[in-house]
Amino acid sequence: MKEKHSLKYVILVTFVATLGGLLFGYDTAVISGTTGALKSFFIDPLMTNAEAAVSVVAEYRITIGLCAALVGVLLSYFLYKMYSRTKATILSSALFIVGGIILYTQFFNQSDVLDVSMANSIRGFVISSALVGCIVGGAIGGAISTSIGRKNGLILAAILFSVSAAGSGYPDGMNVFGVEMVTSLIIYRIIGGVGVGLASMLAPMYIAEMAPAKYRGTLVSLNQFAIILGMNIVYFVNYYIAGLGDSSWLDTIGWRYMFLSELIPAFLFFVMLFFVPETPRYLVLKDRAEKAETVLNKLVGKTEASHELKEIKNSLTQKDAPWLSYGIGVIVIGILISFFQQAVGINVVLYYAPEIFRNMGASTDTSLLQTIIVGIVNLTFTCVAIFTV
């Protein structure tokens, strides 16, 4: 009876943490329903407003430059972690030189006129800008989890999701940056991306540190299920919102509701996090062993709590060893697997599915319905992977 009680508690805290994964998927896919509005509401009016167009192009270049510099700094940091100072300096210098050349030739050495090519480039960056935030969120996730904790890190992610949803829905009314409206939208999408990056790292970490060993693999895999489920939910939400009016309404008002709909799961995630504890591992790390044992009592029962606490303490014993000395090859293989997973082009489908179907002749409603089918297929084979691997 006690084990059943503990399992129910484990499932409860896992459910709360997987809301972070759900928001990951929700935030990633919500943009797919707004691609048409991004052109008609944000880009097309600039074609007849030369002054605003010049300002948008300038802000776009500055934003691209800042994002590229930030990513370059993060990559350089990891290069210095992995290699000697001399080798890391050479690689970092090469990285910035090549990156600078690409930026100059592709973005800065172009006309200030907002032509069709530049307009498409800006719209494409708006759609994918959250990925910049993902890089930042993923890079700082480790430091966040160590400094303020896994739970507080997830609370921060929930706040970022909420700010992004509200700001993306009203980039004009919440434009506190003093920039053009489309640039304000980009900034809020990047903020949401930081939340995605944090959640993608901290949610599975939280689950892994809370789950008993015999359930850990299954429960952690539920986070991936939640990500795909979040995508499917927002596909249905976008389809429902699109049905509330015609295409003109969708391009002027409806797209706002799509972004704002994320506030509901984000607020739910934020509130529920206050009803779950910090992980025992983090509590031990901060010399709060008694509190850690209290949490373990709820997770595994009193008979196992002392043993689990001892194992956690042993695992945190400091050992002097070079960074990644346990095998850089394993890390490289893991990174390459993730890289090639993205390189197949799945994000193009996730972001542009409705537009792809519209260009094939489907109406707005039909294209969103077809996107739901894509999401269901994605969810189905995610379940196959979870329960067969």
Which residues make up each language-model segment?
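Conserved H-loop
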Residues: 302-306, 363
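Short, well-structured alpha-helical segments
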Residues: 305-314
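Alpha-helical transmembrane bundle of multi-pass membrane proteins
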Residues: 1-290, 295, 314-389
